[in-house]
Amino acid sequence: FGGGYLAADAGNSSWLNTVVTIVWIVGICNSINFFDNLDGAASGAVAIAALGVFFIAFDRGQELVSALSIVTAGATIGFLMWNKSPAKIYMGDAGALFLGVIISVATIRLNPGITPTWQSLAIPVMLLAVPLLDTCVAVFSRLARGLSPLTGGKDHLSHRLVRAGLT
């Protein structure tokens, strides 16, 4: 768990690296799963993030990370053709959580070569900013109304944009 570049930014403490890595993986898995609330949302976000990881990893000579990310991008773009509105197939929890694991591990293993290394944390966060922001908005909205953050609802950013007529 603690061997990635993302976790290495937590310092020299192996237990802290492990905790940061687990929190990142679980957080991204849930963000992608939460973001799978509208046709094409999760697959589109993962495709964009995977392409971003690919370009950085390829430029830095990280063959395995670039291969994993380009395959993920290709698979999600192929899936997106069937999942765009009106969707003919759906990803479901199994697909969204699987993509969450893949993209979270790819961002952990990504070494953008930025110093100081704590600044390299911004790259995975920027690549996954939309699902992360959507999750934060939905969770805080539910908590503010006294609801469990794990209950379903129409308080995601995508639902708000649809209600406002912006999508």
Regions picked out by a protein language model, each given a short descriptive name:
Residues 1-136:
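"…together with the soluble PPM/PP2C metallo-phosphatase catalytic core" -> "…together
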